[in-house]
């Protein structure tokens, strides 16, 4: 089973399925969805043992949040939503749960065959994005 430290590093997006549908379900407008679909971001995960930081970096936009596992915090998402978010590490996966305006979404990051697999779920819409480690 993976540990938080095994998720640490720079990861590059290599495959994406269902991202437009997920963004639509979250409430992202068409213009931002088109831009989001074109982006091939790097995901940079760092941890000092207590705090976790996730930075999503592309030529179009860079977003970052830091948190302590198990503690709720306010996150500003790439599309500008303000969410109440909590991250936990459960069964070898980093689970990020967001709530805003009576809605909720869960983003799970886990290792599969040496790749970072990110699964985003809202209602019955699921998006899977696969990243390969670059450093």
From Swiss-Prot:
N-eicosanoyl ethanolamine binds at residues 43, 109, 131. Its main location: cytoplasm. This is Fatty acid-binding protein 5. Pfam families: Lipocalin. It comes from Bos taurus (Bovine). Belongs to the calycin superfamily. Fatty-acid binding protein (FABP) family. One of its GO terms (molecular function) is identical protein binding. One of its GO terms (cellular component) is cytosol. The modification N6-acetyllysine is found at residue 17. Disulfide bonds join 120-127. (9Z,12Z)-octadecadienoate binds at residues 129-131. Hexadecanoate binds at residue 131. A motif (Nuclear localization signal) lies at residues 24-34. The modification N-acetylalanine is found at residue 2. Most abundant in lens and retina (found in the mueller cells), moderately abundant in heart and testis (found in the Sertoli cells), and present in very low amounts in lung. It is found in: Cytoplasm; Nucleus; Synapse; Postsynaptic density.
